[in-house]
Amino acid sequence: MDKKLLNLQSQHWESNFSSKPEMFGFEPSYSAKKALETFKKNNITNIIELGAGLGRDTIFFAQNGIYVHAIDYSLSATNIIKKRSKENNLDDLIKVENYDIRKKLNCDNENFQACYSHMLFCMALTNQDLKDLNQEILRVLKKGGFNIYTARNHMDGDFKKGTHRGEDMYEMNGFIVHYFSENKIKSLLNGFTNISIENFDEGSFPRKLS
């Protein structure tokens, strides 16, 4: 596995976010809407969002009264979130950080009620990266906190297409995607209790996610 190639993905995303600031649109994702139901049901008002992208879910959560610490490794993306949070008068509810989540998170222990990430886990992250990230999430969550994430799965039409980049990662059109099996999801439960795994579609292709 070429780690240098995986590291170059940050430049590819930076280029795309800077040239296509509306590439994901402004409507919240299905997963954000489902997560909000969980947050409201459990009186969650303080979350960390990893891989916030262009902030469509960040803004949605803040508009519903939830404080969001939004992290992304693209400087263009975090600048766009800052701009949008100001335009929507949500500065008090959104903290934006430009950071690589493969490093130890800049957060205190037991600081958040929940962690949310939409398709971050299926980026160019090795199995070890994912295990390390999972332990960091566990560290920054309060006891009984929720870790809600989505990833493209083995039922996705693009699985095993393109160039194999090691483990369950394949590259197409310059993007490396890590595809998840149910066993992989369960392997990341160390320290967590599985509440549910839901399969769903996103987009017109559609992408198959869990």
Segments and roles (model prediction):
Residues 125, 142, 190:
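Short conserved AdoMet
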